[in-house]
Regions:
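N-terminal juxtamembrane/topogenic regions of multi-pass membrane proteins
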Residues: 1-7
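Extended alpha-helical interaction modules
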Residues: 3, 14-178
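Juxtamembrane boundary at the C-terminal end of a transmembrane helix
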Residues: 275-281
Length: 281
């Protein structure tokens, strides 16, 4: 169990392996998306949230989750790949019992990283294989990459909802003096709060990357980022943050413009009244 300061939680379920490597594709197919495992993880997460209580700001367990299967294997002999040919690795990572096309095999094993002669890690979007006598560092990097992925996906969904709310607020409020109403003020503050919360979460997740000072761990994380398409979600989040900023800016500018126009009208009316008083006097 790992708890991250930016509001994420990772539950790790360890299952001892026995048997031959050729049986791993069938095992992978059984484990991927397994409802009982997901339920067990959510139960643990719920208990931890209840245990921490007031230490959590706005406690809630999101319906969104991300499961990721990692096979941590011990190296055997001098040839680490002797019992793990590319075709078998690909079937394990893709949880496929049958044969895969050559291009699928190449794609599945394309993200392979090694630190020494006695280890290697193959990362795919659905799972990974770590062959190492001390796999904890690699497992920690993979864990964080998946936390990063689900945070970006959650943030992307939240920003999508925020944009829809902002578009509705802008459409309702950009009609004349209505933009100065109390409701528009609430909408504007809400947009600003969403923008600040999203930007703070984005920075918190990315600042955590600074923990990977080791060059190999940084390279492993980069490989995981590419395979999990985290960069795509980050770009989407940044675009939506910019869109929110644009909407918020336009609402504020329009409010300033309307206030200036109303002030001009008030000044003109006051001058007219003053002149009227002088003429009648």
């Amino acid at each position: 169990m790992t708890i991250f300061h930016f509001g994420a939680m990772s539950v790790r379920l360890d299952i001892p392996l026995t048997g031959v490597t050729t049986a791993l594709p069938q095992l992978a197919r059984t484990l991927v998306g397994q409802a009982d495992l997901l339920h067990a993880a959510r139960t643990v997460a719920t208990e931890v949230i209840q245990l921490l209580g007031p230490a959590i700001v706005r406690p809630a367990l999101s319906a969104r989750c991300e499961d990721y299967l990692v096979f941590a294997l011990l190296p055997e002999g001098n040839d680490l790949r002797a019992g793990l040919p590319d075709e078998l690795i690909a079937r394990i990572l893709r949880a496929e019992e049958g044969a895969l096309a050559p291009e699928q095999v190449r794609d599945a094993v394309s993200a392979c990283t090694s630190y020494g002669n006695d280890d290697f890690t193959v990362i795919d979007w659905n799972g990974a294989i770590v062959v190492d006598r001390t796999p904890e560092d690699a497992l920690s990097v993979l864990e964080f990459a998946n936390v990063e992925l689900i945070e970006m996906r959650w943030l992307d969904d939240r920003l999508e909802d925020a944009l829809e709310e902002a578009f509705r607020a802008a459409a309702q409020s950009m009609r004349g003096a209505r933009i100065l109403s109390v409701q528009t003020g609430r909408h504007t503050r809400r947009i600003a709060e969403l923008q600040i919360d999203a930007a703070a979460l984005y920075e918190s997740v990315n600042n955590a990357l600074k923990l990977f000072g080791d060059q190999w761990l940084a390279r492993l994380h980069q490989s995981a980022t590419q395979r999990l398409h985290i960069d795509d979600y980050e770009r989407s989040v940044l675009r939506k943050l910019e869109a929110l900023d644009s909407i918020y800016g336009k609402l504020r500018d329009r409010q300033v413009q309307i206030r200036s126009e109303l002030l001009e009208v008030v000044v003109i009316v006051l001058i007219a009244l003053e002149m009227l008083v002088l003429v009648r006097g």
